[in-house]
């Protein structure tokens, strides 16, 4: 597989693995020649932007980040921040983007272009040692994405010199996105991609696909029939379309070893 088709998911960087381990994993990935990372301000229990910017101080890295992640303060989120406590400064930083009202993102005002501008400027400051490549809206409610809004969102991203993106789009928004906005990058679960592949393959949108490892694990548990046929067909689509990329969550030495095998031969993905 071409390394340029691999993006590293960092949802666990800062939470499941600590700061030191995150730095070690990133060093190994950069040695492999992979420098494109997918994140959001609340990934890694609120530490992800902080960790990636530390990496960016000494390396040229590309970042895809997101606005609107559906996360609010609860006991679990609070515990994870205590668990990964580094110092008071970073602990305070981890609460920077947390929301106390989980329903606020359902309001149209939350997705106002001015709100996006404020968020982007804040993200840009937090990631000032990195290059932001794509600015995603994270799972926006389906009633937000009408033609006029997407036009304004595209124009806004153009002023920031970043690619506009929609992460985890609603099924009802897909036709509008692929028929009228080929400039907007889409990030979606593998199941959604496969379900809509006939439409998507006819479009010119760039697509990033996630939940790859989760599907492999679930398929094995459920003893799904024709697994190899599905995976070979899927991987053939990826290898023959450079506009499609895989978002892979890598967070350990073991997963890095597996990633090396995938780069050597894409079919090794099925054997992970």
Where in this protein do the model-derived segments appear?
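N-terminal binding-site loop/beta-alpha segment at the start of enzyme catalytic domains
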Residues: 1-67, 71-82
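A short alpha-helix capping/helix-coil boundary motif
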Residues: 2-7, 102-103, 131-134, 179-181
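Alpha-helical membrane-targeting segments
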Residues: 71-114
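Non-cysteine beta-strand/loop elements that form the S-adenosyl-L-methionine
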Residues: 62-67, 89-94, 206-215
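Beta/alpha (TIM)-barrel catalytic core signal, keyed to glycine-rich beta->alpha loops juxtaposed to Asp/Glu
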Residues: 41-45, 117-272
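Active-site mouth loops of central-metabolism enzymes
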Residues: 9-20, 101-118, 223-228
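A broad, low-specificity signal for short, low-complexity segments enriched in glycine/proline
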Residues: 25-26, 95-100, 149-151, 173-176
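Short N-terminal helix-initiation segments at or just after the protein's N-terminus
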Residues: 5-11, 78-80, 103-105, 150-156, ...
């Amino acid at each position: 597989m071409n390394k340029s088709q691999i993006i590293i998911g960092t949802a666990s960087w800062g939470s499941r693995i600590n700061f030191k381990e995150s730095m070690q994993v990133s060093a190994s990935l950069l040695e492999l020649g992979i420098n494109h990372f997918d994140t959001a301000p609340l990934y890694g229990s609120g530490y992800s932007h902080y960790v990636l910017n530390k990496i960016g101080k000494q390396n040229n890295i590309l970042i895809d980040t997101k606005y609107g992640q559906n996360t609010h303060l609860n006991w679990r989120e609070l515990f994870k921040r205590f668990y990964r406590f580094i110092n008071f400064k970073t602990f305070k930083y981890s609460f920077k983007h947390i929301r106390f009202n989980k329903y606020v993102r359902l309001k149209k005002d939350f997705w106002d272009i001015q709100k996006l501008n404020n968020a982007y400027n804040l993200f840009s400051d937090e990631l000032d040692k990195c290059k932001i490549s794509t600015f995603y809206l994270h799972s926006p409610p389906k009633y937000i994405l009408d033609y006029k809004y997407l036009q304004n969102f595209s124009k806004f991203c153009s002023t920031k010199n970043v690619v506009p993106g929609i992460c985890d789009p609603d099924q009802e928004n897909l036709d509008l996105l692929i028929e009228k906005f080929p400039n907007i990058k889409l990030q979606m679960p593998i199941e959604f991609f496969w379900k809509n592949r006939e439409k998507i393959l006819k479009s010119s949108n760039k697509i990033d696909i996630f939940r790859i490892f989760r599907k492999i694990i679930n398929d094995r548990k459920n003893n799904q029939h024709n697994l190899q046929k599905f995976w070979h067909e899927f991987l053939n689509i990826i290898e023959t379309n450079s506009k499609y990329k895989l978002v892979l969550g890598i967070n350990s030495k073991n997963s890095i070893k597996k990633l090396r095998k995938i780069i050597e031969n894409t079919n090794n993905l099925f054997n992970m």
